């Protein structure tokens, strides 16, 4: 018996590395030293930094992977993986430097895995960070054939005196909501239950435009890194930022705000995408659970002074991203301890 008989194809792994090499190396920034094949990726810090802080984040794509694997949507989950990590680290005003991926699978499918990595590489390219390395683990008997899991790791850098940590947020500041592309990459355990309940498949259409339901659900996560970079380069003072993922607005927006303040949102200030209404109706999801599970059309939030709202909206428009003033910051009531107000009762 040999390793291949046991379920691990080393030759297929080598062929896979050669297949993805050009996509990976196309993401490399000038600071990257060397190419694929080393025990660790090497990268210099960008020149001109005085007191750099490194910002690190890690995440996955959750059970969206199961739906993607069922429908061979491998490229999109690569973009999702980058979005889940990069959108977190940029909330501190940091510039993404490099990304690492981990792929675990039951049996290596070079074509499917190449599509995943090409999606990761494209996400890195759009975010300005290098895909510095990764690991692909073939684990027969642990994962079913055709099944894989993903994890991503992003490291970014910010000058210590330019770090955005919410300390500048004050009463009267405005909250700008930036549109999501859909469900993004959280809440899919609930999504999959709704799909099973309705017996939806790849031919199921929904909404007034008769959109393909599965394709819409698998739309990749919006990458907000270029937007934040453009705002910072335009010297727009950002007081706080929040990536709206698991827990929705109620559990993510308050994370960027000091505890003596409360965020107050107006749900009527943006139109909830019809996909979320379909999920609620089809799954009979209570309104409270909907708000605490999904982004409901707002994937990222910016907290700014009232006088720069128009500047922020202009930069969002230049990025072809819809954005709306969705609320404001107020002084919190010590007696209630609430961090967010305005949700439907």
Swiss-Prot record:
<dbReference type="InterPro" id="IPR010918">
    <property type="entry name" value="PurM-like_C_dom"/>
</dbReference>
<keyword id="KW-0067">ATP-binding</keyword>
<keyword id="KW-0547">Nucleotide-binding</keyword>
<dbReference type="InterPro" id="IPR036676">
    <property type="entry name" value="PurM-like_C_sf"/>
</dbReference>
<dbReference type="GO" id="GO:0005829">
    <property type="term" value="C:cytosol"/>
</dbReference>
<dbReference type="GO" id="GO:0046084">
    <property type="term" value="P:adenine biosynthetic process"/>
</dbReference>
<dbReference type="InterPro" id="IPR036921">
    <property type="entry name" value="PurM-like_N_sf"/>
</dbReference>
<protein>
    <recommendedName>
        <fullName>Phosphoribosylformylglycinamidine cyclo-ligase</fullName>
        <ecNumber>6.3.3.1</ecNumber>
    </recommendedName>
</protein>
<dbReference type="GO" id="GO:0004637">
    <property type="term" value="F:phosphoribosylamine-glycine ligase activity"/>
</dbReference>
<dbReference type="InterPro" id="IPR016188">
    <property type="entry name" value="PurM-like_N"/>
</dbReference>
<comment type="similarity">
    <text>Belongs to the AIR synthase family.</text>
</comment>
<dbReference type="GO" id="GO:0004641">
    <property type="term" value="F:phosphoribosylformylglycinamidine cyclo-ligase activity"/>
</dbReference>
<keyword id="KW-0658">Purine biosynthesis</keyword>
<keyword id="KW-0436">Ligase</keyword>
<dbReference type="GO" id="GO:0006189">
    <property type="term" value="P:'de novo' IMP biosynthetic process"/>
</dbReference>
<comment type="pathway">
    <text>Purine metabolism; IMP biosynthesis via de novo pathway; 5-amino-1-(5-phospho-D-ribosyl)imidazole from N(2)-formyl-N(1)-(5-phospho-D-ribosyl)glycinamide: step 2/2.</text>
</comment>
<dbReference type="GO" id="GO:0005524">
    <property type="term" value="F:ATP binding"/>
</dbReference>
<keyword id="KW-0963">Cytoplasm</keyword>
<dbReference type="InterPro" id="IPR004733">
    <property type="entry name" value="PurM_cligase"/>
</dbReference>
<dbReference type="Pfam" id="PF00586">
    <property type="entry name" value="AIRS"/>
</dbReference>
<dbReference type="Pfam" id="PF02769">
    <property type="entry name" value="AIRS_C"/>
</dbReference>
